[in-house]
Amino acid sequence: MSRVCQVTGKRPVVGNNRSHAMNATKRRFLPNLHTHRFWVESENRFVTLRLTAKGMRIIDKKGIDAVLAEIRARGEKI
């Protein structure tokens, strides 16, 4: 399973660790992913999404039905 938010599309990015001597070593910055179950009243079922904390805030703002419609419009299967 890839480390990608299903709502925002955020994925890992690459950067550098920097020591005190400013030596650079490669590292990955991972998104703050959580697996969360949402009750969808219109479909009378639970939907499990893998999303970031920001994605949860978007669902709080727009509602689960609107967000699911956007995800399905992109062609993702839920």
Swiss-Prot record:
Cellular component, GO annotation: cytosolic large ribosomal subunit
Keyword set includes 4Fe-4S: no
The entry's keywords: Ribonucleoprotein, Ribosomal protein
Species of provenance: Glaesserella parasuis serovar 5 (strain SH0165) (Haemophilus parasuis)
Top-level taxon of the source organism: Bacteria
Record lineage: Bacteria, Pseudomonadati, Pseudomonadota, Gammaproteobacteria, Pasteurellales
Protein name stated in the entry: Large ribosomal subunit protein bL28
Family the UniProt entry places it in: Belongs to the bacterial ribosomal protein bL28 family.
Keyword DNA-binding recorded: no
Any GO molecular function: structural constituent of ribosome
HAMAP family: Ribosomal_bL28
UniProt xrefs under Gene3D superfamilies: Ribosomal protein L28/L24
GO biological process, one term: translation
